Amino acid sequence: MSGALQKMDEFNLDDYIRAIHFDSFKVPKVPFQLPVSRQYYGLKEMREGELDFLKHTVLSKSMEPLHLCCDMPVEDMAQDEEFAKKYMFGLAMVLKKGLHIHIIHDVERPMKDMMLGLENWIPLYMTGQISPYYLKGIQNKVYCHLHYTSGQAAMTGDCISGHHDTAHYYLTSRREEVEICRKNTEYLLKKAHLLMEIYRE
């Protein structure tokens, strides 16, 4: 806890931007062949799914905001350092594109998961392009869920609590499926409360 708080206290947005070469990022314009839909099973494929969702989002022409809500475990996903770097780079590309992110955090996570999430997200909060939320009350501890939407892509996922390795993710860019998923993430956002307000000045 003290280490995370120290990192937050010492954080400097300008230093962070220089460290990851954010200002030199270029959003790709060359079309990539991405699947219209795909199923993902197991931790390795789920990591691929997270990155594929970000690719769909960055490469699409849509400037609609992202809606992210996930109470899946994060520690086992983050154990792959290469994935963690690619994921944070993908989020940086989303922000570089100019998109806004609405994220609903699971504040009932184990402390280790919470600290890991905060250390990764706090620097990105400082861009002013992220609005963090949370859901009040103790949530369902039997099932874990994931709901992501952007302008032209959506991803859903579920697993039994304690069995993340057998989770199932589904990514789609089919318009009618994306619309349904977007409505669900908007419903979730209406039930959520603002976690913090970000001021750049």
Residue ranges and their predicted role:
Residues 70-85, 106-115, 138-140, 161:
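Short acidic, S/G/P-rich loop/turn micro-motifs used as interaction or catalytic elements
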Residues 134-178:
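HKD (HxKxxxxD) catalytic microenvironment of the phospholipase D
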Residues 104-144:
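HKD-type phospholipase D/PLD-like phosphodiesterase module
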Residues 4, 54, 118-121, 181, ...:
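Generic structural signal of hydrophobic/aromatic residues within well-ordered alpha-helices
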Residues 161-201:
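Signature of lipid phosphatidyltransferase scaffolds
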Residues 2-103, 187-201:
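PLD-like (HKD) phosphodiesterase/transphosphatidyltransferase domain
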